[in-house]
From Swiss-Prot:
It is an enzyme of class 3 (hydrolase). Its main location: secreted. Keywords: Hydrolase, Protease, Secreted, Serine protease. Its EC number is 3.4.21.-. This is Cocoonase. Protease that shows preferential cleavage after Arg and Lys residues. It is found in: Secreted, Extracellular space. It comes from Limulus polyphemus (Atlantic horseshoe crab). Residues 1-14 form the Peptidase S1 domain.
């Protein structure tokens, strides 16, 4: 993921 949150799994693909 680029420029987002990664909590265990990619969340909010910002």
């Amino acid at each position: 993921i680029v420029g987002g949150f990664t909590i265990g799994i990619d969340t909010v693909p910002y």
